[in-house]
Amino acid sequence: MGIPVGKSMLVLLISLAFALCCIAAYRPSETLCGGELVDTLQFVCSDRGFYFSRPSSRANRRSRGIVEECCFRSCDLALLETYCATPAKSERDVSTSQAVLPDDFPRYPVGKFFKFDTWRQSAGRLRRGLPALLRARRGRMLAKELEAFREAKRHRPLIVLPPKDPAHGGASSEMSSNHQ
């Protein structure tokens, strides 16, 4: 005859929920905040430098800064590159100006967060698109706890013996020998 309306609606809702989960898995979103955002911007923009707000030519009346876009919303490599500064001089001009600097000129990192490994990790995550659960610190902790729980469950003994109670366990054999 036909499938009842209630069952068909249930199947439709389940398949819709499954489809939404699959779509969310294929669209990874990366959020970067604080030092990790600065490190990633320094890595992506390298010697060009970067802005925390977009240049005035692209800005509208209510433009969001990179912190609002990357820390509170999803952030990808293309968005980060829009905040890179354009080089002021051509490559030829830069090479001649560097020759003027003395050799003992101090070349310190500009910025508090100068960790190349952190740059590579953040930019690598942006390129790879790891699941959001593994990217978040809280998610990594939950994953470790889950793995520890599974490991403990795997090594659980088959039979748990009760602890010996002196009133019942050890004393009963002595008392029975005294009564005989």
Swiss-Prot record:
Residues 65-85 are annotated as: A. Residues 92-180 form a propeptide. GO terms for cellular component: extracellular space. It comes from the Eukaryota. Residues 25-52 are annotated as: B. Residues 160-180 are annotated as: Disordered. Residues 53-64 are annotated as: C. Keywords: Carbohydrate metabolism, Cleavage on pair of basic residues, Disulfide bond, Glucose metabolism, Growth factor, Hormone, Mitogen, Osteogenesis, Secreted, Signal. It is found in: Secreted. Proteolytically processed by PCSK4, proIGF2 is cleaved at Arg-128 and Arg-92 to generate big-IGF2 and mature IGF2. The record marks R48, R58, R61, R62 as: Important for interaction with integrin. GO terms for biological process: animal organ morphogenesis; cellular response to mechanical stimulus; embryonic placenta development; embryonic placenta morphogenesis; exocrine pancreas development; female pregnancy; glucose metabolic process; in utero embryonic development. GO terms for molecular function: growth factor activity; hormone activity; insulin receptor binding; insulin-like growth factor receptor binding; integrin binding; protein serine/threonine kinase activator activity; receptor ligand activity; transmembrane receptor protein tyrosine kinase activator activity. Disulfide bonds join C33-C71, C45-C84, C70-C75. Residues 1-24 form the signal peptide. Residues 86-91 are annotated as: D. Interacts with MYORG; this interaction is required for IGF2 secretion. Interacts with integrins ITGAV:ITGB3 and ITGA6:ITGB4; integrin-binding is required for IGF2 signaling. Interacts with IGFBP2. The IGF2 locus is imprinted. Paternal inherited gene is expressed, while the maternal inherited gene is imprinted, hence silenced. The insulin-like growth factors possess growth-promoting activity. Major fetal growth hormone in mammals. Plays a key role in regulating fetoplacental development. IGF2 is influenced by placental lactogen. Also involved in tissue differentiation. In adults, involved in glucose metabolism in adipose tissue, skeletal muscle and liver. Acts as a ligand for integrin which is required for IGF2 signaling. Positively regulates myogenic transcription factor MYOD1 function by facilitating the recruitment of transcriptional coactivators, thereby controlling muscle terminal differentiation. Belongs to the insulin family. This is Insulin-like growth factor 2. It comes from Rattus norvegicus.
